[in-house]
Amino acid sequence: MKPPSTQSSPAAVAAAAPAMDSAAAADLTDVLCEFDAVLADFASPFHERHFHYEEHLERMKRRSSASVSDSSGFSDSESADSLYRDSFTFSDEKLNSPTDSTPALLSSAVTPRKAKLGDTKELEDFIADLDRTLASM
């Protein structure tokens, strides 16, 4: 990635985002200037770099690995991963299962698909079992 050829100026930021107030524009300018400095630093040879990114990265890794865990023994990142994984499962279950508010007529009106040519016996058995399960609900 090449660093941008033009530096961000407060006037350019203000022109690009006229709806921003002056404090937000100043903050954005500071962030863009810092970003430009980092890009320029990465473009320089390793021994001439001004910032110590490896040290900062290791410090952040240590800080995140020493995050506070709850009483369950799972760290924040493990809990977040689990929640993220389970949210898909939960949404699939919620979408594909009838609820108390679903009228009985709607759930019985859905007809199961017929097995297509080339399907295996195992798949047909699974569908038949699924039909029986849905019929008993």
UniProtKB/Swiss-Prot annotation:
Induction details: Up-regulated in oligodendrocytes in response to complement activation.
GO biological process: cellular response to hypoxia; complement activation; fibroblast activation; negative regulation of angiogenesis; negative regulation of blood vessel endothelial cell migration; negative regulation of cell population proliferation; negative regulation of cell-cell adhesion mediated by cadherin; negative regulation of cytokine production
UniProt note on tissues of expression: Detected in kidney, heart, brain, lung, skin, spleen and thymus.
Region (Disordered): 57-111
Low complexity bias: start-end ranges: 65-82
Localization in the cell: Cytoplasm; Nucleus; Cytoplasm, Cytoskeleton, Microtubule organizing center, Centrosome
Superkingdom, natural source: Eukaryota
Modified residues (Phosphoserine): 67, 69, 71, 75, 91, 97
Keyword annotations: Cell cycle, Cytoplasm, Cytoskeleton, Nucleus, Phosphoprotein
Annotated Polar residues bias: 96-110
Modified residues (Phosphothreonine): 111
GO MF assignments: protein kinase activator activity; protein kinase binding; R-SMAD binding
GO cellular component: centrosome; cytoplasm; nucleus
Protein task: Modulates the activity of cell cycle-specific kinases. Enhances CDK1 activity. May contribute to the regulation of the cell cycle. Fibrogenic factor contributing to the pathogenesis of renal fibrosis through fibroblast activation.
Assembly and binders: Interacts with PLK1. Interacts with CDK1. Interacts with SMAD3.
Name the UniProt record assigns to this protein: Regulator of cell cycle RGCC
Encoding gene (name): Rgcc
